[in-house]
């Protein structure tokens, strides 16, 4: 027997159906090994603390509910001991959606690759840290793919009100549609915002004023894509005049011909009443066709401050079925990562006369828009007639 037994190494046992799940969990929940990047969906969505139950046919349907707020009015004057006048009650708005399944590109290791790693293990005197690090890098790539997928869907939902998944090489099509009221889809003012002469700030304030008349005094924020903010808003004539006026009144230097920076804009915008804080949206993903973005290019969003919704998730059907009915000749180890949203599966199976070792990452999750009655989508490319 070899002095250093590769089959008893940490790396080899990651595929063991008995010890593998525990070892995988230790690795996948270690922040020094698996990195958590500040992706788009994490900035705008939380994770539903409840797992959506799965029906007998494998379908997991979630319900997004929002209780509509009652408007506050001035109090009624009454005679002593007089009763109150009952107010009209508002109901609960809701919509449903089905949680889809996703899988990242898999890693397949064949016998010659495993043999090379065993020799590397022996040459390093039984130290498999380098081999485990390579495995972690492979899993990290899959986690990044899952994060990008959630971000793409989240950006679509926030800027379009629906998710139509066209990425990857698998199933394509519509996933869900939030029940955003028709009156929440608005256009630009007299001119499209791309026109330097457009009164962008005036239009933003007007949209907010109309929203507050409908919704009441709730804290709002603007979500504007990076390119629109820098290529449209910062080059707008009304914005330039506001910045120049602000800097002149506050005795701040103005360089002729110098463009407006984000810092200059944020200093000056406080002098323009009626516009909520602006959050710049940045999100891009890599797909088989190149770089893509889920956010609709010419859309700005006005919505309540805070998270836009939750990531709805359910259990992976693969784990349940394989643990109950899986072939005994195939070994599998499952573990969670990504705050429980993603499932890593290591599989050992036969391929002809040799074994193969597979690593896959799966996800049954989708973002839901949970402030949809108060979510306003502005098409800045279309002017009002």
Regions found by a protein language model. Give the residues of each.
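Intrinsically disordered, low-complexity coil segments
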Residues: 49-62, 86, 90, 124-125, ...
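Long, contiguous amphipathic alpha-helices that act as assembly "spine/axial" helices in icosahedral shell
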Residues: 100-181, 199, 203-204, 208-228, ...
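Sequence/fold signature of self-assembling virion shell proteins
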Residues: 238-385
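Assembly/oligomerization interface modules of large self-assembling protein complexes
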Residues: 37-121
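N-terminal alpha-helical "arm" segments
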Residues: 1-54, 58, 368-385
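A structural signal for short, well-ordered beta-strand segments and their strand-loop junctions
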Residues: 53-58, 221-225, 280
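Charged, low-complexity intrinsically disordered segments
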Residues: 177, 182-194
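Charged, long alpha-helical assembly modules
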Residues: 189-255
């Amino acid at each position: 027997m070899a002095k250093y037994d590769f089959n008893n190494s940490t790396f080899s046992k990651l595929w063991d159906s008995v010890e593998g799940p525990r070892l995988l969990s230790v690795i996948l929940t270690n922040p020094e090994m698996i990195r958590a990047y500040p992706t788009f969906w994490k900035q705008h969505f939380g994770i539903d603390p409840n797992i959506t139950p799965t029906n007998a046919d494998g379908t997991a349907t979630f319900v997004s509910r929002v209780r509509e707020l009652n408007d506050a009015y001035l109090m009624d004057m009454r005679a002593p001991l007089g009763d109150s006048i009952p107010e009209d009650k508002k109901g609960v708005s809701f919509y449903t959606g089905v949680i889809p399944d996703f899988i990242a590109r898999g890693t397949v290791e064949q016998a010659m690759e495993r043999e090379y790693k065993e020799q590397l293990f022996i040459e390093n005197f039984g130290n498999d840290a380098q081999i485990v690090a390579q495995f972690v890098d492979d899993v990290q790539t899959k986690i990044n793919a899952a994060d990008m997928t959630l971000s793409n869907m989240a950006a679509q939902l926030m800027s379009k009100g629906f998710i139509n998944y066209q990425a990857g090489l698998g199933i394509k099509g519509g996933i869900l549609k939030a029940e955003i009221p028709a009156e929440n889809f608005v256009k630009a003012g007299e001119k499209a915002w791309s026109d330097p002469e457009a009164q962008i700030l005036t239009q933003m304030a007007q949209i907010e004023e109309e929203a507050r008349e409908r919704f009441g005094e709730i804290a709002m924020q603007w979500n504007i894509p990076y390119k629109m903010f820098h290529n449209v808003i910062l080059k707008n004539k009304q914005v330039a005049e506001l910045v120049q006026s602000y800097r002149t009144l506050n005795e701040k230097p103005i360089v002729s011909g110098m463009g407006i920076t984000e810092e200059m804009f944020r200093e000056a915008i406080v002098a323009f009443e009626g516009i909520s804080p602006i959050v710049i949206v940045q999100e891009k993903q890599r797909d088989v066709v190149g770089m893509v973005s889920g956010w609709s290019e010419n859309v700005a969003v006005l919505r309540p401050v805070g998270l836009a919704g939750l990531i709805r998730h359910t259990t992976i059907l693969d784990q349940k079925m394989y643990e109950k009915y899986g072939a005994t000749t195939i070994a599998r180890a499952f573990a969670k990562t990504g705050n429980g949203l993603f499932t890593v599966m290591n599989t050992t199976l036969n391929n002809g006369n040799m074994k193969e070792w597979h690593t896959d990452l799966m996800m049954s999750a989708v973002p839901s828009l949970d402030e949809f009655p108060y979510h306003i989508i502005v098409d800045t490319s279309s002017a009002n007639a």
